[in-house]
Regions:
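Active-site acidic carboxylates
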Residues: 1-109, 113
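Glycine-centered short loops/turns at secondary-structure junctions
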Residues: 61-64, 136, 162
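Internal catalytic-core helix/loop-beta-alpha segment
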Residues: 96-144
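A short glycine-rich beta-strand->turn/loop micro-motif centered on a GG-aromatic cluster
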Residues: 141-144, 162-177
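Short glycine/serine/threonine-rich phosphate/pyrophosphate-binding segments
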Residues: 147-154
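Active-site-proximal loop->helix
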Residues: 175-188
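A charged, well-structured terminal subsegment
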Residues: 191-201
């Protein structure tokens, strides 16, 4: 890995991205289905959820804008797409399906945005970017699942919309350690600041 780091550095990747206020928090898809190893979960996701409880408490204490995302398909699958074709089980995530509900310990409060999405990114086809912009957010802390999937997609889009993404490394999780580690490395090189919760706060 040291050789890879040197290669990236020589080519100009991995430049430090300094967080600047105001801050916001995005929690990506921490729903029951991704907390359950029998459905879409496993790996280090339970620990990431527990760490996000503390991160969310701090965000609320500081008065930061907080947004959550859920995957929600129409009851009749009228909005079924290539994402659902690639991962058919996701089509079971409906508005009232328990698997699509945000885990109780991170339940949204009044004034927090809940984005319903059918694509990996929490930004694609949603009001999230406008909502964050209206609240003046410059640095967006990101937690959620999975690191290699919807978290990464949301981080890339956050950067593309002009926000500074800060991936809180112990508050994101994946069902397998390899993809988790590889995507944290890659996001740190190209798209985001990446650091654990204690350092981020």
């Amino acid at each position: 890995m040291e050789q890879e780091i040197q290669t990236y550095a020589r080519q100009g990747f991995g430049t430090a991205l300094q967080p600047v206020a105001p801050y916001g928090l995005l929690i990506v898809d921490f729903v029951n289905g991704f907390a359950d190893p029998a459905q879409f979960g496993g790996g280090n996701i339970p620990g990431a959820i527990a760490n996000t409880e503390r991160l969310l408490a701090t965000a609320r204490e500081q008065g930061w804008p907080v947004a959550h995302s859920r995957i929600v398909f129409a009851d009749d699958n009228a909005d079924a797409n290539v994402f659902g074709l690639k991962v058919p089980g996701l089509l079971a995530l409906k508005e009232d399906a328990p698997a699509s509900a945000i885990v109780p310990q991170l339940a949204p409060r009044a004034g927090e945005l809940v984005v319903r999405k059918t694509e990996p990114s929490a930004f694609f086809g949603t009001q999230l970017a406008a909502w964050l912009t209206q609240r003046g957010v410059r640095t967006l802390l990101v937690a959620g699942a999975t690191t290699s999937g919807c978290v990464r997609a949301s981080v890339v889009d956050a950067m593309s919309h002009g926000f500074r993404p800060l991936v809180v490394s112990d508050c994101v999780g994946d069902r397998a350690q390899g993809p988790h580690d590889a995507n944290l490395f890659d996001m740190a090189q190209k798209y985001a600041a990446v650091m654990p919760r204690e350092q981020a706060l």
